[in-house]
Curated annotation (Swiss-Prot):
One function term, GO molecular function aspect: zinc ion binding
Keyword entries, A-Z: Aspartyl protease, Endonuclease, Hydrolase, Metal-binding, Nuclease, Nucleotidyltransferase, Protease, RNA-directed DNA polymerase, Transferase, Transposable element, Zinc, Zinc-finger
Keyword Lyase found: no
E.C. number(s) listed in UniProt: 3.4.23.-, 2.7.7.49
Reactions catalysed according to its record: DNA(n) + a 2'-deoxyribonucleoside 5'-triphosphate = DNA(n+1) + diphosphate
Stretches for region Disordered: 173-195
Gene: pol
Entry-linked Pfam families: RVT_1
Protein name per UniProt: Retrovirus-related Pol polyprotein from type-2 retrotransposable element R2DM
Gene Ontology biological-process entries: proteolysis
Source organism: Drosophila melanogaster (Fruit fly)
Keyword Metal-binding among UniProt keywords: yes
Reverse transcriptase domain span: 384-660
Compositional bias segments (type: Polar residues): 183-195
Stretches annotated zinc finger (C2H2-type): 61-84
Length: 1057
């Protein structure tokens, strides 16, 4: 160090000697006589920016990109990393000279050498130099002399010697009827194949069923006759008979045309608003979820093209010829797939029922009518179809509908075709898909359409590879591929060949081939339907079997990728992450990624698929360990002859709904996503309870996927919760000092049940990370430590006051306790003992208007504008009751004590009594209202006495304050009547010899039941859960009536003089 004298003291200064004249990568080596010279380890900035620290204190360091000046190089470096990362990559990038051989390059060159040697090529070094252009002949020669390289050569040759020769698998034509007859006559001399054995087992199962006892409309005897004659008449005749039978039990239904009267043109804005409200309410009654999503997504501007445009376009896409054969090796499975084509059981039928909300197929069979079929009849139908290996003609046809991909869809390619086959076909294919899915040893890199959280698996793998590369300064090249119309263009021949390669039973392969070659479809749009045609390619989106068939073809692709190419994560190599047709490739070198792209393109072209080069992109991360950094470089990669775009460090891209950059997951801000939708929900013609329902069940859950797998800060989550609470208060007209816990506590505990993203997001992330399954990275220490670190970070975020909120019940309990500790929420403490009483809060029923719901919520949380409430924190103001009572004007005083609301209190009490009385009479009880019982202790008048089967039940109703335990009040009421003199009087008066029981219907003025009271009434059969819910609403309404009566008479006061 050198020292210079300044007025403030001595400032140390480091002397730097710069090597080179520019900031380029062509730097000369440091000569031996300059070994003592010190120079920076990383040449990041131009030469003129290197100045002594003492001089830097006097002169500022400018940024060459934006011109901003800084006091030090460190400040400039921070600025470059945060504001100009792409320009910083350009400055940091170095040209490799005599770069080290990576393990991936060694494997690729060894495999290429084996290939060249097998082809009889000479001058191997020069030939290899042609393929490895970035390596010199001398470098290749030296590598070939190494022992580890020679071991790789021997290993590859050993694998080639063990690999069997595989012939191309082609689709043979189906045998003619005469050939089939000849095969039948010669079957006695040939051994029984597994296919014939399975058919015999299915037919034996059909004949072994016991007779079905059912209604005559199901024609059980006719179906049994078809089964008995099946082996004599053959499969074609059996199919025809089965088709006629299905038409008999499921009569063909015509197309339903609903006549909708066009709305009258509104005369003014009020009438226009009423019409909009009526339309939204009708849609709400039909399907709440669809109505909410249409309101949240804004105006749907999608317009389906006319039939003249849609039909030619999609018919050409679906009927284009596809490759007739697909070559590949036979995939070895751990166990046989013969179970796929075996007799269907009753358990299979129960597990594969079609949802009642699903649409019917062209045959008109609805899911409800299919469920009405006796299980014995349905078992026979399904197994007959299995035995025949084809579908009956009456259920072969499917209809294809189109759903828009975006709200601005206008072109034919902007719509997604969805096939809607018969409900019976969907149930049968669901059974076969479940069996096939559980029998295949799937490649661990394929996570789509499998019973696992595939999105979490693959999104976390991409994040792991990116972050691991930057942390350890390793090179990594990534390609995100977009398959154009993957489900609509897949070759049928590739499906059949893949099923054979995986060892699927012949009967199953024939069934798939028959359904695809013999099953037609018709295109349906807005009021039009095309003629039936048979698609020549593509899988049927909407059919349960289609995802599994597509997965099989993609699984075959993954098995063809070279295992030695890929990104190295610890001691494992991963080269692909697939979710159905979303494919991401990883490689350690540029050449390795190009090899993976070529392999993928070759396979996809064979199976009839194409890559959309414009939508594909690559990310090239170059590791520079000596400089302890990574840089993004724009390398050229090709799909065929088309170049793929290369992304920079700041470019964002989306994979499985999660935003990424080259450094990993991108910080997301959920407030930006939910803010506009909250505004749309505010303007929508909905009731307040409907807005809360939409917020709780649709809008907030839409954020869960991005919050669980993306990156989000705790502060951002708190701000989003604050934004949500602002709109909730606005919708319900709540004051600002309403407890926050009231918004987030669950309805069963007295709150509104709005999820708090601050706690829900880390909990969901921890749960999804805990469910991640990486079979190919199970023993990888790097992957395991990465997962554990991420889970621990989520756990740390869930620590609240020394308690870990690791589950949803724990979060709900946390908010409920905070609510009960507040002044306004203490009266809801006993609300958690019985859940159905809160149904009106969480479910948008027609019991309450929007105004009544808002007032009920304010009553529930003690937010009505009484004097005590409005003068809170200002004790100098008057708080006495405006009616002249010698008590503070509180909500409890108005509801329970004030003389002005006495009449409403009586009406509230009588309303509860009448509801219980009506329910008892519906159960066959004889009910006496307020009988006068003259006893030794005086006159007693219980509200209800119910007589049933010589048994007496005495019920008395009370609505109490919320300042005391309601269970204690319930017990006091029972003790009030459960006395010997009252029992004696009841037996004398009603001449009952049975038991006498005493009950109370105890609630507080908020509409909260005593847990012991309501549970005892329900257990004794004196009250239903529905009635308890209605009574809770009636008490709340009665309390509101008390308050309204008090406020209406607030101009008058009692003269106490």
């Amino acid at each position: 160090f050198e020292r210079k004298n300044f007025s403030d003291g001595l400032v140390p200064q480091r002397k730097f000697i710069h090597i080179g004249t520019t900031s380029t990568n062509n730097e000369p080596r440091i000569p031996l006589h300059n070994l003592m010279t010190t120079r920076p380890s990383v040449d990041i900035f131009p030469e003129d920016q290197y100045e002594p620290n003492a001089a830097a204190t006097l002169s500022r360091v400018p940024c060459t990109v934006c011109g901003r000046s800084f006091n030090s190089k460190r400040g400039l470096g921070v600025h470059m990393r945060s504001r100009h990362p792409d320009e910083l990559d350009e400055e940091r990038r170095r040209v490799d000279i005599k770069a080290r051989w990576s393990d991936e390059e060694k494997w690729m060159m060894a495999r290429k050498e084996v290939e060249l040697t097998a082809n009889g090529c000479k001058h191997i070094n020069k030939q290899l130099a042609v393929y490895f252009a970035n390596r010199s002949v001398e470098a290749i020669k030296k590598l070939r002399q190494r022992g580890d390289y020679k071991e790789k050569i021997e290993q590859i040759r050993g694998q080639s010697a063990l690999a069997p020769e595989v012939a191309n698998l082609t689709i043979r034509r189906r045998p003619s009827r005469s050939e089939q007859d000849h095969q039948v006559t010669t079957s006695e001399t040939t051994p029984i194949t597994p296919f014939e054995q399975s058919n015999r087992e299915i037919l034996r199962t059909l004949r072994g069923y016991s007779p079905v006892e059912c209604h005559s409309k199901w024609r059980a005897q006719e179906l049994q006759t078809i089964i008995d004659r099946a082996h004599l008449e053959g499969k074609e005749t059996t199919l025809q008979c089965l088709s006629l039978y299905l038409l008999g039990i499921f009569p063909a239904q015509g197309v339903r045309h609903t006549l909708t009267r066009p709305p009258r043109r509104p005369r003014n804005r009020r009438e226009s608003r009423r019409q909009q409200y009526a339309v939204v309410q009708r849609n709400w009654d039909k399907h709440k979820g669809r109505c909410i999503k249409s309101l949240l997504n804004g105006t749907d501007e999608s317009v389906m093209p006319s039939q003249e445009i849609m039909v030619p376009y999609w018919r050409e896409v679906m009927t284009q010829p596809s490759p007739s054969s697909c070559s590949g090796e036979v995939i070895q499975m751990d166990h046989s797939l013969e179970r796929v084509w075996s007799a269907i059981t009753e358990q299979d039928l129960r597990a594969s029922r079609v949802s009642l909300s699903s649409s019917p197929g062209p045959d008109g069979i609805t899911p409800k009518s299919a469920r009405e079929v006796p299980s014995g009849i349905m078992l026979r139908i399904m197994n007959l179809i299995l035995w025949c290996g084809n579908l009956p003609h009456s259920i072969r046809l499917a209809r294809t509908v189109f759903i828009p991909k975006t709200v601005t869809a206008k072109r034919p390619q902007d719509f997604r075709p969805i096939s809607v086959p018969s409900v019976l076909v969907r149930q049968l294919n669901a059974i076969l898909a479940t069996r096939l899915n559980s029998s295949i040893n799937w490649d661990p890199r394929q996570r789509g359409f499998l019973p696992t959280d595939g999105c979490a698996d693959n999104a976390t793998i991409v994040d792991l590879v990116l972050r691991h590369s930057h942390k350890h300064f390793r090179s990594c090249y990534i390609a995100n591929l977009d398959v154009s119309k993957a489900f609509d263009s897949l070759s049928h021949a590739s499906i059949y060949d893949t099923l054979r390669a995986y060892g699927a039973p012949k009967g199953f392969v024939d069934y798939v081939q028959n359904t695809y070659e013999g099953g037609g479809t018709s295109l349906n749009g807005d009021g039009w339907s095309s003629e039936e045609f048979v698609p020549a390619r593509g899988v049927k989106q909407g059919d349960p079997l289609s995802p599994i068939l597509f997965n099989l073809v993609m699984d075959r692709l993954l098995r063809t990728l070279p295992s030695e190419i890929g990104a190295k994560v610890g001691n494992a190599i991963t080269n692909a992450a697939a979710f159905a047709d979303d494919l991401v490739l990883f490689a350690e070198t540029r050449m390795g990624l190009q090899v993976l792209l070529d392999k993928t393109l070759d396979f996809l072209s064979i199976v009839g698929l194409k890559l959309n080069a414009d939508k594909c992109f690559t990310v090239g991360i170059k590791g520079q360990p000596k400089q302890k950094c990574t840089v993004l470089e724009a390398q050229s990669f090709y799909v065929g002859s088309s170049e793929i775009p290369s992304l920079k460090r700041t470019d964002e891209w989306k994979y499985l709904g999660i935003n990424f950059t080259a450094t990993g997951r991108v910080r997301c801000n959920p407030a930006e996503d939910i803010g506009p939708k909250l505004q749309r929900l505010t303007k929508a013609p909905l009731k307040p309870q409907q807005r809360l329902f939409a917020l709780r069940t649709v809008l907030i859950p839409q954020l869960y996927h991005k919050l669980a797998l993306g990156s989000v800060a705790i502060g951002v989550l708190r701000k989003t919760d604050k934004l949500i609470r602002y709109y909730v208060r606005r919708w319900l007209n709540l004051p600002l000092d309403v407890p926050i816990a009231f918004v987030h506590a669950p309805p069963k505990s007295g709150g509104l049940g709005i999820p708090s993203l601050r706690w829900v997001a880390p909990m969901l992330r921890l749960r999804r990370l805990s469910n991640i399954k990486w079979p190919h990275l199970t023993q990888n220490e790097v992957a395991s430590s990465f997962l554990e670190a991420e889970k621990q970070r989520a756990r740390d975020r869930l620590l609240a006051e020394q308690n870990e909120l690791l589950s949803r019940p724990a979060i709900e309990k946390y908010w409920a306790n905070k609510l009960y500790l507040s002044v306004d929420g203490s009266g809801l403490r006993e609300g958690g003992h019985y859940g159905p009483q809160h149904g009106w809060v969480s479910q948008p029923t027609r019991l309450l208007t929007g105004k009544e719901y808002m007032d009920g919520i304010r009553l529930r949380i003690n937010a009505l504008p009484t004097k005590s409430r409005t003068t809170r924190g200002r004790h100098e103001l008057e708080r006495q009751c405006r009616a002249g009572c010698d008590a503070p004007e509180t909500t409890n005083h108005i509801m329970q004590k004030c003389y002005r609301s006495h009449g409403r209190r009586v009406a509230r009490h009588n309303c509860v009594v009448n509801r219980i009385k009506r329910g008892l009479e519906e159960r066959g009880c004889v009910v006496i209202v307020e009988p006068s019982l003259q006893c030794e202790s005086g006159l007693n008048k219980p509200d209800l006495v119910a007589l049933r089967q010589n048994h007496i039940d005495v019920i008395d109703t009370q609505i109490v304050t919320d300042g005391h335990s309601m269970d204690d009040a319930h017990q006091r009421k029972i003790n009030r009547y459960d006395r010997p003199d009252i029992r004696t009087e009841l037996r004398r008066r009603f001449e009952a010899a049975g038991d006498i029981e005493f009950h109370s219907a105890t609630l507080n003025w908020r509409g909260i039941w005593s847990g012991q009271s309501v549970k005892r009434l329900i257990a004794k059969g004196l009250l239903s859960k529905y009635d308890s819910h209605i009574i809770s609403v009636q008490v709340m309404r009665g309390s509101l009536g008390c308050f309204k009566q008090f406020m209406y008479l607030s101009g008058f006061s009692r003269d106490w003089t």
